[in-house]
């Protein structure tokens, strides 16, 4: 309890001990928001993708990293994304389709010139084998996110420089999320 005289005050705390309850509370608020928007049973992978997509890089190269993860949580950015120029950004949630092994989905997205693009793919993986080699990846479903620009340049998820996706890199393993952030470039 923090008191200044007889008045309550706010204390500043940091670290994972404070970040965990903040993110848990934000996840609960995001779930409530989705329910009010008509998503009757929002899954945890959808909520995780929303929170990752709205995070703000706080300056430690490069995201994600052990010091800041995906950055500072911003529920405003997550639920009401706005571009750097102040325009409302379109949001698409597709969590109704199932992907069969060895197959993929292709989406064509038109992006206005000068607008950026943030994409997060997240999923709840099946439990791994308890008899698998302890040093082996336990990921059962290994999904990859790639984005190809109109001029044929391909970007892989989770490959960043200065907070933005860059070409090159290798497929990211073993994680159950992948993220891509494009500069204000013509990507569709």
Where are these regions (language model features)?
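Conserved beta-strand and immediately adjacent loop positions that scaffold enzyme active sites
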Residues: 7, 142-144
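Hydrolase catalytic cores
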Residues: 6-7, 11-61
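Single conserved hydrophobic/aromatic residue that forms the stacking wall/gate
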Residues: 1-10, 179-182, 186-188
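Noncatalytic accessory or regulatory domains flanking protease catalytic cores in secreted, cell-surface
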Residues: 11-16, 64, 146-181
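Acidic glycine-/aspartate-rich tracts in secreted/extracellular proteins
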Residues: 56-59, 124-126, 152
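Secreted peptidase-domain scaffold signal
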Residues: 64-141, 149
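Short glycine/serine/threonine-biased micro-segments
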Residues: 3, 13, 67-69
């Amino acid at each position: 309890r923090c008191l200044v005289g007889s008045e309550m005050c706010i204390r500043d705390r940091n670290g994972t001990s404070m970040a965990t309850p903040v993110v848990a509370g934000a996840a609960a608020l995001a779930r409530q928001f989705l329910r009010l928007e008509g998503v009757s049973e929002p899954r945890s992978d959808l909520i995780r993708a929303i929170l990752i997509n709205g995070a703000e890089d706080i300056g430690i190269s490069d995201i994600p990293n052990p010091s800041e993860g995906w950055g500072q949580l911003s529920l405003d950015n997550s639920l009401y994304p706005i571009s750097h120029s102040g325009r409302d950004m379109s949001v698409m949630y597709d969590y109704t389709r199932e992907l069969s092994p060895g197959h993929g989905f292709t989406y064509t997205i038109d992006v206005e010139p000068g607008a950026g693009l943030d994409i997060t793919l997240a999923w709840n993986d099946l439990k791994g084998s308890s008899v698998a080699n302890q040093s082996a990846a336990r990921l059962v479903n290994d999904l990859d996110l790639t984005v190809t620009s109109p001029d044929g340049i391909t970007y892989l998820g989770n490959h960043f420089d200065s907070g933005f996706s860059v070409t090159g890199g290798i497929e990211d393993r073993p994680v159950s999320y992948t993220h891509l952030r494009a500069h204000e470039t013509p990507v569709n």
